[in-house]
Amino acid sequence: MQRQVLTEQSLYYGDVDMPKDWDIDRDKLSGDILQSVIQNKDFPFSRTWDMLNTYMRDHVGLEYNVNLINKETWGNIYKPAEITIPLLNIDPVDLRNSPDFTLLYGVKVKNCMVRIHYEDNRRKGRSWDIELKDNMFIMFPSTNMYYLTNNQKDSLNFVQTITYEYI
């Protein structure tokens, strides 16, 4: 008897564990998110963002042999008790130009849940819940719909999103 795996979905998550004295300046990232949201402009390039992006691409590439290039990046601010609409970072009619992976990074978050929807063959409508914490990332296939819930009632949640193409 033989077995062949035809498809598999991998989710990657954990803390961003930067080398000593190279910590991500989350105050700078949250300021950049605030500025881009208020001014309705693209997220600005910064050394801090580049450190995060380089860390993610290098570590996923080295540990899991998943080589990535950037597609887009933006930041979101979620109000207390806010639940997003279901989010999907692909264009179903243009999959060729859609990203392969979505990364969520907790810039400044408190009691933030992420629900990722997936299908397991004929078992449709499955979901997986994970708490997004400060300095934590969650990366998953962009074909998965997801939403975020800000469960607390006293502060904003800042989340950085980066989409990648698999090469």
Model-derived regions, located:
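Non-heme Fe(II)/2-oxoglutarate
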Residues: 1-74, 84
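Catalytic core of non-heme Fe(II) oxygenases with the double-stranded beta-helix
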Residues: 69, 74-144, 149-151, 156-158
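Double-stranded beta-helix
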Residues: 161-167
